[in-house]
């Protein structure tokens, strides 16, 4: 998450200034930064160029979706009772607000999931930083039918 925050915070700087900031990091941090540097995509590119579990920044205009069918899936939450651990399946729609992030040029959209407890995303052009995750329609699916961005940070673009 540190890399996402850093990349988003320096995103408005020109490449020269970005390089100066990155050069100030010690060697270990520079290696970590280069290894986990986010991929920057448009919503229209996310399905074809996105990589599952990769740090990603997507730019577009979010629109809160009310459709519960767009975001069918579950997250397994471990529950410990004494020495016994069981898992509870929680519907993703219960813990996330789901947005369609629209591409200005092609009007294509990509799903992003934003924590329900957080402030709503503005309906204006923003950069959303997070991790790409797979969205399986059911747990028996081998390959995910869709991807979504689990949003961690966002920044308005003027």
Identify the residue ranges that each predicted region occupies.
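OB-fold and OB-like single-stranded nucleic-acid-recognition modules
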Residues: 1-158
